[in-house]
């Protein structure tokens, strides 16, 4: 059984027992979070939401909070002696999907 959930402005396909990296959540490591915006549930029977499946939830356990690899942003304007170098590390939350309730 799998589900498609929406979190952090993104849609993520999840299965029970799967580890997923998602946009940062306000939860500490070891806490349980519930995703209620379930768009699709697949398996023996298929349920498609309009826009979300009524009564369906996905339960996950927060494994850790972290920050992704550093990327470098470099803006440059030719002939103007104008450049800007900036780094960015995107925060994420690592969760383990425990149960899909549909």
Swiss-Prot record:
- Which GO terms fall under biological process for this protein? translation
Which GO-annotated molecular functions does the record name? rRNA binding; structural constituent of ribosome
SUPFAM superfamilies recorded: L21p-like
- Keyword annotations from UniProtKB, A to Z: Ribonucleoprotein, Ribosomal protein, RNA-binding, rRNA-binding
- What is the stated purpose of this protein? This protein binds to 23S rRNA in the presence of protein L20.
Q: Which family does it belong to?
A: Belongs to the bacterial ribosomal protein bL21 family.
Q: What is this protein called?
A: Large ribosomal subunit protein bL21
Query: What is the species listed in this Swiss-Prot or TrEMBL entry?
Result: Bacillus pumilus (strain SAFR-032)
Q: Which gene encodes it?
A: rplU
């Amino acid at each position: 059984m799998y589900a498609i959930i929406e979190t952090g402005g993104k849609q993520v396909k999840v299965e029970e027992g799967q580890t997923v990296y998602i946009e940062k959540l306000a939860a500490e490591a070891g806490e349980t979070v519930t995703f209620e915006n379930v768009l699709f549930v697949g398996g023996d029977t298929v349920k498609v939401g309009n826009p979300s499946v009524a009564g369906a939830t996905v339960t996950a356990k927060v494994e850790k909070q972290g920050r992704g690899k550093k990327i470098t942003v470099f803006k440059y304007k030719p002939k103007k002696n104008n450049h800007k170098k900036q780094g960015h590390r995107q925060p994420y939350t690592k969760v383990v999907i425990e149960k899909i309730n549909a």
